[in-house]
Amino acid sequence: MDIRICLLLAAEAGLALVLLWSAGVLRKPAHVLCAALLLAAAFVLRGLCLNYETSDYTQFLTVWVDFFRTHGGLAALRESVGNYNVPYLTFLALISGSSLPDLYLIKLFSIFFDVVLAWSVMQLVGLFRREAVWKLAAFFLVLFWPTVMLNSALWGQC
């Protein structure tokens, strides 16, 4: 795996840490250490899945990215490409101009939304429980939930 992909994955883990810090749940050193270790584990597990190619990727997603790459990127959105929603096709058009492998960019995009989902659930739990430990538990339960992890890191679904 390209070092740039590893750095992008680490940046997503860093974003998760910043979100936890800004939510005020990392005020105790023990919480910071625990969160850092759990984030490292969550993102290492995701990193181990990144090389896996699904038939959805090989038969559709990479074909669509190649279409965008050869037909002018965003300009190709005028043509009928794929059967996904327009925002996701726009993302595919945007990454078509990158020199990074599209498999990893697609999965990193999905992993980004794992963090958004975990943060959102943490915020929801915070409406009912004020204690940081409950919020952290909600965040990490979502981040480690098998379907969440497999959907993004292994299957590349958003």
Model-derived features with residue positions:
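Short hydrophobic/aromatic helix or loop-helix immediately within or flanking a transmembrane segment
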Residues: 60-70, 75-105
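Membrane-embedded helix bundles of polyisoprenyl
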Residues: 42, 134-158
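Membrane-water interface at transmembrane helix exits
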Residues: 20, 24, 45, 49-50, ...
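Loop-to-helix entry region of an early transmembrane alpha helix in multi-pass inner-membrane enzymes
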Residues: 2-9, 86, 100-119
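Membrane-helix interface segments
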Residues: 30-31, 104, 130-137
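Transmembrane signal-anchor helices characteristic of membrane glycosylation enzymes that use polyprenol
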Residues: 4-59, 111, 144-146, 150
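Membrane-interface micro-motifs in multi-pass membrane enzymes
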Residues: 1-7, 85, 149-158
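Transmembrane-helix motifs of polytopic, lipid-linked glycan transferases
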Residues: 15-20, 105-129
